[in-house]
Each structure stands twice: as structure tokens, then as C-alpha cells.
């Protein structure tokens, strides 16, 4: 990377292919631990002795409500004090030249003014001021570069962030161009072809990276509010159950 003055590297970095890992994890839980998944069944209410769905009542001594992006659903009353909103992101999958190999996930300095662990540091003030001058269009669109290589050789590249109460299902070509520009500025790619584009939505806001609300002794409402769910989900789950006595 021409012009780079420093970098951070983690030897413990691990990643999985979400498209494969999520269904495989569900299959493993069902086969190895007898977990029953009620696919396509909407929960209408949490009751004193369990929960009520569109097909009936399920008895349960404990209930964990993980609403994800459904901020106006069954968890609305519990989440209302935190004034959460949704943010929409854009991402791309690109095919690099044959033989291209990325040895580690790549992120750039824009991430250092977005993620709270870095952005709350006093040093980030000067960095943000410089980025406002050098990459103002990226900051205005909530862009910070993330590049990872999938097992088929393609690169997943992102992402942008636009907050809204009800995000529209439209992606901006201008935003994609800015993301791709940062890709080529950071990674030595002779060329690449865009093979997929998509948008995603997740909740943001609140006082921390995740909310764990305890309405009573038998109910927990858990939602990641920082876009870090894929990285923190297992640790968060362990903390929730470990502290639930």
C-alpha cells in the first residue's frame, strides 16, 4: 500500500462464510442437541408462562427475545427507551484476477473513526479532521473499507451506512463507486469485476454496542446495536446466559 505509515495485524483472526455457516450451525444444533427450529413462525407476544405465536402457545420457563431489525415488533415496548433506529449498508462481491490471494482481511483508516473502540480515543479527532478533507464523500456516506476473500476467491467489499426510520430498498451507484475507489486505493488489484451487489439493514443506537434488557427474571431482550453481531454473537450469548441466575 503506497503511502501507508502503519498497520495493525491480529494473528488470531478467524472468519467463516456466513452463507454456509448459518444453515450448518442450525443443522448441528438440531442434530447434536435436539434443538427445534420453528421456521417462518412469527412470535406475537411474550406471556407469563412462555410465548404466543401465530400458531399457538409455547410453554417456556425462560425466553430470550432477539428482535434483530424488528424494532416495532414484540420487543418494541422494551426497546423504546433507547431510541434505536435502522442503518442501511451497501456491499459488493468482486472477482479479482486469477491467482490473486489476500492473506488477511483488510480494513482502512475510515474504520478508526467509526468503531467506538477507536473513535472514542482522543487521537481520532485529528484523524477525522484529516479524513474530512481527504475522504469527505466517504464519511458523508458512512463508508469504511472492509475487504475479505471468500473460499471461491472472490472478495467481499464494503460498506456504507445510511440511517433511517424505514430504509428504502434502493442502492446508490455513486456509493458503490466510492467503495470501489477505496478498494483500489488500498489493495493492489490490477482489475476486478463486480459479480454481486446487495443492501443490508441493522439496528443502531443506545448506550453501548449491544443491549441486554431484563424486563423480569425469566425474560431477556438481546440486540446488537453496532453492526458487530457476526463478530461478537457467541461471546455476547455466553455473557447473557452466564449472568442469568
Model-found features: residue ranges?
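Short Gly/Pro-enriched turn/cap motifs at secondary-structure boundaries
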Residues: 81-84, 135-138, 146, 201-202
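Internal, well-ordered alpha-helical segments in soluble enzyme and binding-protein domains
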Residues: 17, 21-25, 39-42, 63, ...
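Conserved FAD-binding catalytic core of PHBH/FMO-like flavoproteins
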Residues: 101-111, 135, 143-156
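Flavin (FAD/FMN) cofactor-binding and adjacent substrate-gating region
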Residues: 1-38, 45-46
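Conserved beta-strand-loop-beta-strand element in the redox core of flavoprotein oxidoreductases
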Residues: 39-58
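FAD cofactor-binding and catalytic pocket of flavoenzymes
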Residues: 118-150, 182-185
Amino acid at each position: 500500500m503506497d503511502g501507508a505509515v502503519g498497520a495493525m495485524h491480529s494473528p488470531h483472526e478467524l472468519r467463516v462464510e456466513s452463507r454456509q455457516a448459518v444453515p450448518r450451525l442450525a443443522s448441528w444444533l438440531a442434530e447434536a442437541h435436539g434443538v427445534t427450529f420453528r421456521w417462518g413462525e412469527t412470535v406475537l407476544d411474550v406471556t407469563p408462562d412462555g410465548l404466543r405465536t401465530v400458531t399457538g402457545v409455547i410453554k417456556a420457563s425462560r425466553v430470550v427475545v432477539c428482535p434483530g431489525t424488528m424494532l416495532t415488533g414484540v420487543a418494541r415496548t422494551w426497546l423504546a427507551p433507547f431510541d434505536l433506529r435502522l442503518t442501511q449498508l451497501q456491499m459488493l462481491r468482486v472477482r479479482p484476477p486469477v491467482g490473486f490471494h489476500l492473506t488477511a482481511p483488510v480494513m482502512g483508516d475510515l474504520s478508526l473513526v467509526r468503531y467506538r473502540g477507536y473513535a472514542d480515543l482522543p487521537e481520532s479527532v485529528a484523524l477525522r479532521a484529516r479524513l474530512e478533507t481527504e475522504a469527505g464523500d466517504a464519511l458523508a456516506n458512512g463508508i469504511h473499507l472492509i475487504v475479505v476473500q471468500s473460499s471461491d476467491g472472490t472478495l467481499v467489499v464494503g460498506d456504507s451506512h445510511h440511517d433511517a426510520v424505514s430504509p428504502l430498498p434502493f442502492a446508490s451507484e455513486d456509493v458503490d463507486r466510492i467503495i470501489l475507489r477505496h478498494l483500489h486505493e488500498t489493495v493492489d488489484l490490477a482489475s476486478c469485476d463486480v459479480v454481486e451487489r446487495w443492501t443490508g439493514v441493522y439496528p443502531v443506537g443506545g448506550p453501548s454496542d449491544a443491549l441486554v434488557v431484563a424486563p423480569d427474571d425469566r425474560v431477556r431482550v438481546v440486540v446488537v446495536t453496532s453492526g458487530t453481531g457476526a463478530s461478537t454473537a457467541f461471546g455476547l450469548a455466553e455473557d447473557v446466559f452466564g449472568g442469568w441466575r
